[in-house]
């Protein structure tokens, strides 16, 4: 897809994608069939270049940017952000709310299946380290999609470099997913679950340690968090 050039007037007409479209790096707006993320004004050109430098991988579950977005200028066009596909399905917040109100029937087994059969294998294959993963960034439809892709670590074998996350650490990211599973457990049909919650948590920690080369401190934080959870 070609780069996108918008006038100042056109940029002011863009509609936010949600009630809370802003993050550390920018704000997301609807544009045609996708989303434009416009950088915050306080970001320097170096910050923008650093963010964009690793947005060059393709994955079936990660919504990578497809085009750069420029604001038209009289003398020079200015880089303002990037364009990416729109995530399909419900994010985990919307899914949880539908479960709580009885509008959707999702079992704990289905969540486990999505995690084990689709989520982890694809991340391992692409060698992606999660960055700012939380309920608002994980979408479920027929597939699982991840947004906020400027917050990942990507191993690039071609140049033997790991591009670092701009946000967050592993333990923060995984904790958000734990919180979702735990807070919603009473609404899931757990009678047919093959794995207990304790086993699920242990396996997640073990799998994350395989996917990432994270430090001992990060894994210790995960284990300390596990011990602090009350399962009853």
What residue spans do the PLM features occupy?
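Regulatory N- and C-terminal appendages and interdomain linkers associated
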Residues: 1-10, 41-48, 212-232
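ATP-binding glycine-rich loop module of kinase domains
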Residues: 11-75
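Conserved hydrophobic "DFG−1" position in protein kinase catalytic cores
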Residues: 30, 86, 139-141
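Protein kinase-like catalytic core scaffold
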Residues: 34, 61, 82, 145-148
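Conserved structural core of kinase catalytic domains
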Residues: 62-112
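Conserved alphaE helix
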Residues: 107-124
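Catalytic-loop of the protein kinase fold
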Residues: 120-141
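C-lobe/activation-segment region of protein kinase-like
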Residues: 141-232
């Amino acid at each position: 897809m070609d780069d996108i050039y918008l006038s100042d007037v056109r940029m002011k007409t863009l509609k936010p994608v949600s009630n809370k479209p802003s993050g550390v790096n920018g704000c997301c707006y609807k544009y045609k069939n996708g989303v434009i993320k416009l950088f915050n004004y306080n970001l320097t050109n170096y910050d923008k270049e650093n963010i964009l430098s690793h947005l060059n991988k393709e994955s079936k579950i990660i919504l990578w940017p497809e085009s750069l977005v420029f604001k038209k200028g009289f003398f020079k066009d200015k880089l303002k952000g990037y364009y990416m596909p729109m995530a399909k399905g419900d994010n985990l917040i919307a899914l949880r709310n539908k479960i709580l109100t009885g509008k959707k029937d999702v079992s704990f087994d289905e969540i486990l299946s999505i995690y084990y059969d689709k989520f982890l294998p694809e991340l391992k294959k692409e060698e992606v380290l999660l960055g700012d993963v939380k309920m608002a960034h994980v979408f479920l439809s027929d597939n699982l999609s991840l947004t906020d892709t400027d917050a990942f670590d990507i191993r690039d074998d071609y140049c033997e470099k790991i591009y670092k996350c701009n946000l967050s650490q592993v333990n923060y990211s995984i904790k958000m997913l734990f919180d979702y599973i735990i807070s919603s457990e009473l609404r899931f049909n757990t009678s047919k679950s093959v794995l207990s919650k304790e086993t699920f948590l242990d396996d997640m920690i073990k799998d994350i340690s395989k996917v990432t080369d994270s430090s001992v401190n990060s894994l210790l934080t995960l284990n300390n968090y596990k011990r602090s959870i009350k399962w009853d």
